[in-house]
Amino acid sequence: MTSPRTLYDKIWDDHVVDVQPDGSSLLYIDRHLVHEVTSPQAFEGLRVAGRKVRHPEKTLAVVDHNVQTSDRSQGIDDPESRTQLEALAENVRDFGIEFYDALDRRQGIVHIIGPEQGFTLPGQTIVCGDSHTSTHGAFGALAHGIGTSEVEHVLATQTLVQRKARNMRVSVDGTLPPGVTAKDIILAIIGEIGTAGGTGHVIEYAGEAIRALSMEGRMTICNMSIEGGARAGMVAPDATTFAYVKDRPKAPKGAAFDAARRYWESLVTDAGAHFDREVRLDAANLPPIVSWGTSPEDVISVQGRIPDPSEIADENKRQSKEKALAYMGLTPGTRITDITLDRIFIGSCTNGRIEDLREVARVVGDRKVHEGVSAMIVPGSGLVKAQAEAEGLDKILKAAGFDWREPGCSMCLGMNPDKLRPGERCASTSNRNFEGRQGPRGRTHLVSPAMAAAAAVAGRFVDIREWPQG
């Protein structure tokens, strides 16, 4: 009789090809997602070695990081970005990989197009040369980012050498209050455990509040596992998962789907399985969260005040937080609701899905973007954009004064034309608030889509729980 196993244990065990003398394992990789930034050297390595892509049908490529979100007929001005986009188009053609280019209606952020195409499925091992690959763990998959040399290894062999991580479970019990979302949950978790709290672990998210989330919400949670230091994050698949996956273009059909579902239903943590670390949060006590510093762990309730670093005993941590406040142009004791904003960014692989855009439109209603605030919405994929337009969300948002863009990573990172100017302060639905992340000397506050939408109208942070309806 085998010992009780976690969800992570089960997927790992099902994919071990060989165990090495040093304790590392060779894992079979089910799905490989590729974009333009981390793949050029990998493909060049294949050419130099005279190798082919072992399983092109298990690989899907898309442009997302460098694409402009304005008029795409104008082409790319930045020569490095243009070179990367052209290289990916050439590489996928030469190696026979399916590819969504900038003009394909299925194009979008890699971690949004995988799930919506049914390329992402429960029980799989999924890799991509991108740190937010953990997003796909929302489906009960083992998904994580890899480096460029590993991208080449997976292209050539469909395998990857890995050491098994430790098991960690974060349980969020109870029911979320109105106005509190999946984004607030994950920001609260990172605030609780810190950016190193999950180091060396794969996190399984569990509890009543997690089970109650939609797939979009679960993807938001798993997306930011890396910001909590974890190798990956995952949620056990259930009826919500199966309903989302069914009838997706690349998902199994008919009897094949039924057979797959029977396997997927076994992907739950056994009673009595061991976790190396356990963390519990009470959903009922969670407020809307705003980040105030330059690390995702620098978070506080929207009703809070900027903390005073002088109260921190550890000298290194105190100096780090003092530096963060200086960069952000904030002083201790300032109310979060007194912080005014220059820019609003709604999008990214964290919060660029149709559910997010519906919530933004609901919050905005017939109101207008505050004078002096520049607000942009970047749908996560062409299909998300088309769905939003079919529902009339774009009309609501454009009438309010939002800039309605084409899909891509956009202002989540400063690798394309969408950047903050020095000193600009932005409420962003993305996943990182590092120095310069959204542009040199730009100041980023991480929030939920609802909080960002309300801030766009008010021109400052407001408590979405007090937002008037209609």
Swiss-Prot record:
Enzyme nomenclature, EC number: 4.2.1.33
Gene Ontology terms describing biological process: L-leucine biosynthetic process
InterPro entries: 3-IsopropMal_deHydase_lsu (IPR004430), Acnase/IPM_dHydase_lsu_aba_1/3 (IPR015931), Acoase/IPM_deHydtase_lsu_aba (IPR001030), Aconitase_4Fe-4S_BS (IPR018136), Aconitase_4Fe-4S_dom (IPR036008), IPM_dehydratase_rel_enz (IPR050067), IPMI_cat (IPR033941)
Cell cycle is among the record's keywords: no
Known catalytic reactions: (2R,3S)-3-isopropylmalate = (2S)-2-isopropylmalate
The record's free-text note on cofactor binding: Binds 1 [4Fe-4S] cluster per subunit.
Pathway: Amino-acid biosynthesis; L-leucine biosynthesis; L-leucine from 3-methyl-2-oxobutanoate: step 2/4
Cofactor(s) recorded in Swiss-Prot or TrEMBL: [4Fe-4S] cluster
Binding site for [4Fe-4S] cluster: 349, 409, 412
Entry's Gene Ontology molecular function annotations: 3-isopropylmalate dehydratase activity; 4 iron, 4 sulfur cluster binding; metal ion binding
Protein role: Catalyzes the isomerization between 2-isopropylmalate and 3-isopropylmalate, via the formation of 2-isopropylmaleate.
Family: Belongs to the aconitase/IPM isomerase family. LeuC type 1 subfamily.
Quaternary structure and interacting proteins, as annotated: Heterodimer of LeuC and LeuD.
Protein's name in the database: 3-isopropylmalate dehydratase large subunit
Organism, as annotated: Methylobacterium radiotolerans (strain ATCC 27329 / DSM 1819 / JCM 2831 / NBRC 15690 / NCIMB 10815 / 0-1)
This protein's encoding gene: leuC
